[in-house]
UniProtKB/Swiss-Prot annotation:
Highest rank taxon of the organism: Bacteria
Family statement: Belongs to the SepF family.
Protein known as: Cell division protein SepF
Function: Cell division protein that is part of the divisome complex and is recruited early to the Z-ring. Probably stimulates Z-ring formation, perhaps through the cross-linking of FtsZ protofilaments. Its function overlaps with FtsA.
Gene Ontology BP term (one): division septum assembly
Sorted UniProt keywords: Cell cycle, Cell division, Cytoplasm, Septation
Compositional bias per record (Basic and acidic residues), positions renumbered to this chain: 48-59
Entry's localization field: Cytoplasm
Assembly and oligomerization: Homodimer. Interacts with FtsZ.
Region annotated Disordered, chain positions: 18-73
Tagged with keyword Cell division: yes
Biased composition annotated in UniProt, kind: Acidic residues: 22-40
Length: 172
């Protein structure tokens, strides 16, 4: 039983466990382990993977697939101002709604004037991560009002001016 008590005391740091202090042992008690040869021999043989170029694939009846970046495939479109979602979150729990709508390609206006500063900062940080991850843009319309645009949507300067001059959003 004393062995268990000593191990616990050593683990907690109450007593020193001198079994592992090499400086306390004489040199003849220090040993080095020698591993036996287990028959392993390094090989210089390289196994080559099958490589097909596009001409070989056509000859075999397979279509050559050209991979394009997603940004090359999606054409930017002008956003309809009626399709912009305006959100007035009162707490951070409403971030999910913002993220889901933005992910669907809908521009989102976040009006954070009704939130306390700590939650507003968290929501702006969330929006910045959302914008970065989905390659969109974020613009500050007024104090505590932000416009989040997906990457395949362009909001015209006229629409931005209308958003900023709308009596509700003009916080300055």
């Amino acid at each position: 039983m004393a062995g268990i008590g000593r191990k616990i005391a050593s683990y907690v740091g109450i007593v020193d466990d001198r079994r592992y202090d090499e400086e306390d042992l004489p040199d003849e008690e220090l040993t080095t382990e020698v591993y036996s040869d287990d028959g392993y021999e390094p090989s210089s043989e390289v196994t080559q993977l099958h490589h097909h170029d596009s001409n070989e694939q056509h000859a075999r009846g397979h279509k050559a697939v050209q991979h394009r970046r997603r940004s090359e495939l999606e054409e930017p479109s002008i956003a309809d101002i009626n399709r912009i979602l305006t959100v007035h979150p009162r707490n951070y729990n409403e971030a999910r709604t913002i993220g889901e709508q933005f992910r669907e390609g809908i521009p989102v206006i976040m009006n954070l004037t009704e939130m306390d500063d700590a939650d507003a900062k968290r929501l702006v940080d969330f929006a910045a991560g959302l914008i970065f991850g989905l390659r969109g843009t974020i613009e500050r319309v007024t104090s505590k009002v932000f416009l989040l645009c997906p990457r395949n949507v362009n909001v015209t300067p006229e629409d931005k001016a209308r958003i900023a001059s709308g009596g509700f959003f003009n916080q300055s």
